């Protein structure tokens, strides 16, 4: 039996610090390419941070035009904290260096990004996992956590 195609538009929530932006404010390699690919395939990018709304960082890196909305990220009680998000904007996948929020909401855990490193390919891996989830409904990559049903 052929695998069922799950291609659909996703709301993808990216953390900022240590996920797409380093300690020194540098942009993680592959961020612009990944954001462009996600937008081209119809997905919606949300940026959230436990350190407030981050439009200034997105503007500095010329990423604002990719982003649907910036939000304050909850730091605890992740499921109940996201209940106030409108249904059509709820996270389908969370991309974060904090495994706890990824496990609670579903998504992809990434290694922390601190300083410029041209060898860093974390966001290439994230892109591959997202494509796998979109086409198969799941990824077998150990960094992926299925969205819990609640």
Task: Please provide the spans of the model-predicted regions.
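C-terminal cap/substrate-recognition subdomain and adjoining C-terminal extension
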Residues: 56-150
